[in-house]
Amino acid sequence: MKTLILSDGIPGHFNQSRGVASLLQEDIDLNEKVVQLEPKIRSLRSPIKLIARYLCNNLTKFKAKIIISFFKPIDSSHVKLIIAAGGNTAAFSAALSLLTDIPNIQLGSPRGIHSKNFNTHLTIEKYFDVPNNVVLDITPNLYSPESCKNASNEKAFLNSALFLIGGQGIGYSYEEAEWNQLIQNIIDFTKLTNSKATIVTSRRTDPSIEELLKNSLSNYFTDDSIWFHDGGANANLAELFGNATKIFVTEDSSMMISESISSGKKVTTLFPKSINTPARYSNHIQKYRDLNLIDSQSIKDQLSFEEGKDNIEKINLIREGLKSTIFTRIQL
């Protein structure tokens, strides 16, 4: 089935769309066509965005044609499903679906566009009291317990923990003293577990902090560690998730957290002293705690390796429930 994935060029949004496509592919064949949505006049991108959203109020085919005309042409012939994420794609997705009668799946907060404009509108909290608005337990991403298990290898027996490191952002602010304490805690943890840690930094990690981690932990991290500012961008984490005995992730990145959770492994989020995050984000993280998908601790606290059951069964049930709901909504 030919599926159009509309991209706004933001990697996190694109990965969410790909995550939904991967979920559906477990039951049906999908032929993905990825197209980046671009306005005809790039300098007018901001007003186009606002006008397109406004036109989605009581959307008609006439209004939909106006919205479509703002953007460079996209060939939708033979397309049977539209998937898109992010506010910048929502108006176009709604308009194209109305004009072509192709079912659409939209991810992300509505930004003023009603969920009724989408067959399935996936959000982390309820915005509209309509069945189209489906509330997610886990933000969609590229990983699943099965994909991580299939990607694992003999290194899964090395008792290694995985550390996903972010940085400043969404109201989380880390002091250097906190990073230094985390470094000492990782050293203590590796000695306690007689293992090395696998460390993955990200776009959000300050280059100086990445260098500090590399230099201070040079004898304590595995060769599989990935350093974003040293050529490690856009790494596929399936193997690392599959091999990890436990996952620690800084709490500033919802995508890193959702990816970690989706592996089915035990996940602990690490937070700094200084947090001034939007309520929507803190509620999102709290929901993961309430579902017992994560536990959380200060980045300065001692790291623990408690034995316990993984979340693989729970994650698989959540995935099956979401997949069933989507198929019902798009009538496939």
Pin down the residues of each PLM region.
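Short internal beta-strands
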Residues: 33-34, 121-123, 196-203, 268
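Structural motif
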Residues: 2, 80-81, 120, 160, ...
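A donor-sugar binding/catalytic signature common to diverse glycosyltransferases
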Residues: 13, 237-278
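Conserved catalytic-core segment of nucleotide-activated headgroup transferases in glycan assembly
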Residues: 168-200, 205
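Active-site and donor-binding regions of nucleotide-sugar-utilizing enzymes
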Residues: 5-134
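Leloir-type glycosyltransferase catalytic cores
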Residues: 285-332
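Donor nucleotide-activated moiety binding/catalytic core segment of transferases
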Residues: 213-255
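A nucleotide-sugar donor-handling region in carbohydrate enzymes
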Residues: 110, 115-178, 301, 305-306
